[in-house]
Design a protein with these regions (language model features):
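Transmembrane alpha-helices and immediately adjacent membrane-cytoplasm interface residues
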Residues: 2-42
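Beta-strand-turn-beta hairpins that frame and shape the catalytic cleft
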Residues: 45-54, 131, 135, 140-145, ...
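Acidic/histidine-rich helix-loop elements
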Residues: 55-73, 96-99, 184-217
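Short, solvent-exposed loop/turn segments at secondary-structure junctions
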Residues: 58-61, 97, 126, 141-143, ...
Length: 321
């Protein structure tokens, strides 16, 4: 929210830009969470069974692109990227799946190409009894239990959390795939920062609308995060949480997970780690967290984006006692 306010007041040439800038600069350790500094990747020195994990908001594989050629190119690029990384478990947000027969295959293509024999999914919208919109987890290894963490009004907000207990060799890990509430910016909101909206009165009106959306989104995300954390405490296995938090490392939502889990990016990487490449800069909002008895290495962020989010991936292993 502070970043959005800064952008607005910078465009408006308001003195409040300098006030909020000072507040950010003096935010202390809270703001240093956005930056990670590691001098080496903490790859284990002993032989381990590692899990290759990916989290990816695919923005419905660009299914609403009016150009069939562009739509297919986006989907194929996403599928090719996943093939190259070759994750054991991939957690999708904003997932689209069309029942067979399909002219725009997604889930079934991934299953056929990469051998994802096991999956768990949750859809809130189903159009013409064939097109499904929601969240999906694909696994190469057996899922022995699965379920959902239900959010308030999930059918109208399109936000979900699913979990699955997955077995690889002698290890069992509970994976959570989450998509938390977004601000739901519309075209008129984006125009607040562009040249199309030049009149002061119009800017003020749009800005008030934006603040109202923030007031709805922040408490909703907080409540959703709290539900996931409470459910996580009941897990009989180590946990990995993947997802689009729609919030930065400075947020209350991030802190809910960071208090008891390890942020894989900060454990392994150096830099800010930008994952959102949409029209309003948001920095790192896609995460892979894990329990303290697990370790992570070889973290990667997708370099060429085929969605408004970059995929994140890393290898997870169980630490020796």
């Amino acid at each position: 929210m502070a970043l959005i306010l800064m952008i607005y007041w910078a465009f408006a040439k308001s003195k409040w830009f300098f006030y909020i800038l000072v507040a950010i600069l003096f935010g202390g350790n809270l703001h240093f969470r956005t930056l990670s500094i590691r001098f080496s990747d903490p790859k284990p020195e002993y032989e381990v069974t590692s899990w290759n994990i990916m989290s990816y908001n695919v923005r419905l594989f660009d299914v609403y692109n009016s150009s069939t050629e562009a739509r297919n190119k986006s989907r194929d690029s996403i599928v090719n990227y996943i093939q190259n990384v070759d994750p054991d478990v991939v957690c999708f947000q904003e997932f689209f799946h069309q029942d067979r027969p399909s002219s725009f295959s997604t889930r079934d293509t991934l299953i056929e190409l990469m051998g994802y024999k096991y999956y768990h999914e949750r859809y809130s919208h189903r159009i013409r009894n064939r097109q499904n919109f929601g969240i999906c987890m694909l696994s190469k290894y057996p899922i022995i239990a699965k379920g959902d963490v239900m959010f308030e009004n999930f059918k109208t907000t399109d936000n979900y959390c699913i979990f699955a207990d997955i077995v690889k060799g002698q290890d069992t890990i509970r994976f959570y795939d989450i998509h938390l509430q977004s601000i739901k910016l519309q075209q008129q909101d984006y125009e607040l920062f562009g040249e199309k909206n030049k009149q002061a009165g119009s800017k003020s009106s749009t800005f008030r609308l934006l603040i109202d959306k923030l007031r709805i989104a922040y408490p909703a995300r907080a409540e959703q995060a709290e539900r996931v954390v409470e459910h996580m405490k009941t897990s009989p296995y180590p946990v990995v949480i993947c997802g689009d938090f729609n919030d930065t490392p400075m947020s209350y939502v991030y802190n809910q997970f960071n208090t008891s889990l390890v942020d894989s990016y900060r454990e392994t990487s150096t830099g800010i780690g930008v994952t959102y490449v949409g029209r309003v800069p948001a920095g790192r909002i896609d995460y892979i967290f894990h329990s303290g008895d697990l370790g992570a290495y070889d973290f990667g962020i997708q370099k060429v984006a085929f969605s408004d989010h970059r995929a994140v991936h890393c290898k997870i292993y169980k630490k020796q006692l």
